[in-house]
Amino acid sequence: MLDVKLLRTQFQEVKEKLLQRGDDLANIDRFEQLDKERRRLIAQVEELKSKRNEVSQQIAVLKREKKDAESLIAEMREVGDRIKQMDEQIRQLEEELDSLLLSIPNVPHESVPVGQSEEDNVEVRRWGEPRSFSFEPKPHWDIADQLGLLDFERAAKVAGSRFVFYKGLGARLERALINFMLDIHLDEFGYQEVLPPYLVNRASMIGTGQLPKFAEDAFHLDNEDYFLIPTAEVPVTNLHRDEILTADDLPLYYAAYSACFRAEAGSAGRDTRGLIRQHQFNKVELVKFVKPEDSYDELEKLTHQAETILQRLGLPYRVVALCTGDLGFSAAKTYDIEVWLPSYGTYREISSCSNFEAFQARRANIRFRREPKAKPEYVHTLNGSGLAIGRTVAAILENYQQEDGSVVIPGALRPYMGNRDVIR
């Protein structure tokens, strides 16, 4: 959520920044209109209350002097009724303003490249060289089917499309990757592990920015008003909702494995085969709470930490800075890490690392004090995938496939796979 003071004092600058996103400006224009009306009404109410206080004193004097005060009393009843009506108008305006604030996206950081779509994203760096095959590389779903690692057909029978059964060494590979990623983030980068709830309440979804904008992409339990989490970002960020932390608490680093659930409402016809786009998938998520002045250094660290996983696995990737038109609703700046998938002949997103500045903290009321009696300030929050597990499985199967249909297990992963070096 944006700072109301920023909207009032730098309205045109904010509007221009949001225009760079390609955002519909109707909400911010409506906000300005309603905010002016609210402040006008508040000024009128204060004026009426001041008048009421003055006249009340006059009435008191008239009563002490045994003089007739009925006309003034009647006038003040009318003033009281007007104040009551205007207070109700103000309350309704404030409700609408609060709703509008929740629907206005974050302002892009000045370093974010300006553009309209993913075509305008800017490549920052590459690591590793895509492998040259002496045979036609197969897509990961064909490799997995031949090795008995994944079963999409039976998952469709049991649940529907965009679900999968991991079987045998496929299930072990998934579990190995979860443990491998967590061990690196905990032991080398100092994250604290949390295992979050998979169901969250509405306030949590609002806090991280999933609601109200992305309601159609969420799985909602109507009878309890719970939501299945689309990412561990939601419960872990809300871990400190409505709290005031101390300066000594920061930075806070959390690493969380969870299943993630997404309706993929806008993805009809896209990535219909394989592990790239599922309704349910596993992910290791990294979440940071930091002081505002540290957040952009922390974004660089976060991105490098996610990259480390791909480097240890020997998977070629690139890092791109998202342009303003491709930036997520809550993010001020985002780097996507894209892994090379031979069957696609291109790089595909495997991690998204974002700095939200105070946008989520303001929605979730997460603050800190620099000194014991100092005024609370909003923390900055960051998160990133460290990594998406299913897409990592896909990348390993495709990049390490052999002509005979087997798959070599990356060296760093072998201790987690019973010291196997190949899947046959």
Swiss-Prot record:
It catalyses: tRNA(Ser) + L-serine + ATP = L-seryl-tRNA(Ser) + AMP + diphosphate + H(+); tRNA(Sec) + L-serine + ATP = L-seryl-tRNA(Sec) + AMP + diphosphate + H(+). Belongs to the class-II aminoacyl-tRNA synthetase family. Type-1 seryl-tRNA synthetase subfamily. One of its GO terms (molecular function) is ATP binding. This is Serine--tRNA ligase. ATP binds at residues 262-264, 349-352. CDD domains: SerRS_core (cd00770). Disulfide bonds: none annotated. Pathway: Aminoacyl-tRNA biosynthesis; selenocysteinyl-tRNA(Sec) biosynthesis; L-seryl-tRNA(Sec) from L-serine and tRNA(Sec): step 1/1. It comes from the Bacteria.
